[in-house]
Amino acid sequence: ANAQTTDALGTYTPYSLFGLGDIDKQGTSFNRGMGGIGIGVRDNRHINYLNPASITERDTLSFMLDFGINQKNFYNTDGNVESGYNTANMQDLIFTVPIYRKSAFIVGVTPFSNIGYKFRESETRTDIISKYGNISYEKYGTGSISQLFLGAAMNVTPNLAVGAQMIYY
């Protein structure tokens, strides 16, 4: 049997049934495009929430906004059964604003993990089918954990910036 579906699942994998779910890769699309690097990047054109001190490297007269969308295609096979899902999620919403000279404030929300699974099985025992009719069992789960963060940073010297960030899950 083949199926291709789009649903409101943040992810589609049977492994998300366990624990916190499918842990998201952290960082903006810029960080992901660089292989997930975050600590060593300090750039005036991109927001890097993985390194709070990096937000001081920006124009002191303007704010910055980053909004990302993530789309995935999942294809699962198990013996003769194949299924596919398409998912699209918000990846991040981050805002930075200058405070004073080379200091800045950052606030944002990003996903931490996603849960999304859907299992369906039909009853095959003839005694149960003859007594109750066709029966289909379904397990469905969805959810996510997001992280909200606030941070601030300032330049101590021209080559040294200090930043701190608080994260709420």
Predicted feature residues:
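Subset of outer-membrane beta-barrel
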Residues: 4-169
